[in-house]
Amino acid sequence: MEHLETCYNSLSKQTYKDFEIILVDNNSKDDSVKFTEKNYPDIKILKVNYNSGFAKAVNGGIKISIGEFTLLLNNDTECKEDFLEEMLKGFSDKDTGSVACKMINFYDRSIIDDAGDFIKLKGSPYARGHGDQDIGQYDRHKYIFGACAGAAMYKREIFYELGFFDEDFFAYYEDVDMSFRMQIAGYKCYYNPKAVCYHKRGATTKTMTGFETMLCEKNLIAVRLKNYPFLTLLKCSPYFMIVRIKRYYNFLTKHSSSLFMSAVKGYFKGLLEIPKSLRKRKFIQKSRTVSSEYLENILK
């Protein structure tokens, strides 16, 4: 509840006032719903009677929203008073499909949490600037690969054009997948460093777990198969394998055998889902308006 109260209160102080709040309660075990109903009666609540995963939960919220733009916001965040106002400024270009903010560590506000999401051409997704001291190095407005769905704004119509978050992902990398699909279709992601929120990273999911590791490994295979240009996929496949072997060796030697086994399990789950990923690829590639060179250039 402490996370929700902080988040709600920061939204109530926004300089931009024309918005609705939707709480998607993904079968929480605390009194989040009762707390919200009692203290914030204007908030719309979507109750899910089982843990459907992040992707399905936010899809449900998007579908019942009514605004032109949709902000996805984790409950463990606090937004500066002009956050919504600054996020909306990012849509001045008609080709902008999403806006990324500058996320700061809630507990140490001199530390960057996320300054936009990227994916390495031959490696894995990463949060730009995560853990860095905030000395102004991420204060430049620019177009980037994608936004972290923990605090990202999207044109709502895009979900109806390109599809919603992939519910087969359950959680992790579904935002990377969506960013990729938007880039393929010619929609840009605008990073506005003046839109600032504070994030208690891991406050509701804890740290590295076997389940998280399994999902990340499984979903990364799907992200690549669905979105990479075909020749890029072929060219980079050997490097993908080398990077995974190094990663799994690190799990085995520096973490635990259970984490290693979770990673391997996720990898093989991803392989088993190849036919499904390739079917999705056909749909995604039909919307492609950019070149392979463009896509390779935005992968850092």
Residue spans for each PLM region:
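Active-site-adjacent helix/loop segment of glycosyltransferases
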Residues: 185, 189-279, 292
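A recurrent flexible, glycine/aromatic-enriched loop bordering the glycosyltransferase active site
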Residues: 111-114, 121-126, 132-157, 176, ...
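A short, conserved alpha-helix in the catalytic core of glycosyltransferases
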Residues: 145-196
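Short aromatic/hydrophobic "clamp" motif used to bind/position activated sugar donors
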Residues: 70
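Conserved donor NDP-sugar-binding/catalytic core segment of glycosyltransferases
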Residues: 77-120
